Amino acid sequence: MDPRMYRLIRLPSYGLGNNNNDPNQQRGERQRQPHPDLGWILDAPNEPPRNRNPLLYLVTAPPRPRKKRSFMTTSKPFRIQTNVSDLQYNAWQAIQDAPPEKRCEYYVKYMDEHMNSQNYPNGMGLPHRWGQF
């Protein structure tokens, strides 16, 4: 066999003899060296310096997002039941489109058209203080 082939094939020494030219041993030593950034951590003192205020170095975390509620579980606001009939409520909605100076006339016309015995037989649906037809 050619002696140059022996130079190409490098077998590990397995600790036999002190062969400093063994690349496997050199690679192992390189791996055993500590990380270069680890030096400043190992050289650091065990306790922080006492002359500095620790509150100055606290990092405030950003506010956590609020929990989003499902519309199925949120309660709806309670509507107070007033003594207003459907007729008055509908009339109030109808006069919102009228100009402010003509709302009174528009309200009277609306009530005249809609407050009849066909819509409210025997006054059913109207406030009791209005009486019966």
Swiss-Prot record:
Residues 12-57 are annotated as: Disordered. The keyword Repeat does not apply. Glycans are attached at N83. The keyword Glycoprotein applies. Residues 16-26 have a biased composition (Polar residues). Keywords: Developmental protein, Differentiation, Glycoprotein, Spermatogenesis. GO terms for biological process: sperm individualization. Post-meiotically transcribed gene that has a role in late spermiogenesis; required for actin cone progression during spermatid individualization. Belongs to the male-specific scotti family. This is Male-specific protein scotti. It comes from Drosophila pseudoobscura pseudoobscura. The gene is soti.
